[in-house]
Amino acid sequence: FRLDEEFQGPIASQVRRQFLFRPRN
């Protein structure tokens, strides 16, 4: 799951935080 490389920007930080805060059940 390498989205940071393609999403290098201010949104990447928010997206990464949401993914980390969102439990993938």
Curated annotation (Swiss-Prot):
GO terms, molecular function: hormone activity
Gene Ontology CC annotation, any one: extracellular region
Main localization, broad class: secreted
One Pfam family from the record: NMU
Signal sequence range: none
The keyword GTP-binding is annotated on this UniProt entry: no
Asparagine amide modifications at: 25
Protein location: Secreted
Keywords: Amidation, Cleavage on pair of basic residues, Hormone, Pyrrolidone carboxylic acid, Secreted
Keyword Ribonucleoprotein (UniProt): no
GO biological process: regulation of smooth muscle contraction
Modified residues annotated as Pyrrolidone carboxylic acid in this record: 18
Entries under InterPro entries matching the protein: Neuromedin-U_amidation-site, NMU_C
Family that this chain belongs to: Belongs to the NmU family.
Role, per record: Stimulates uterine smooth muscle contraction and causes selective vasoconstriction.
Protein name stated in the entry: Neuromedin-U-25
Organism of this sequence: Canis lupus familiaris
Gene name in the database record: NMU
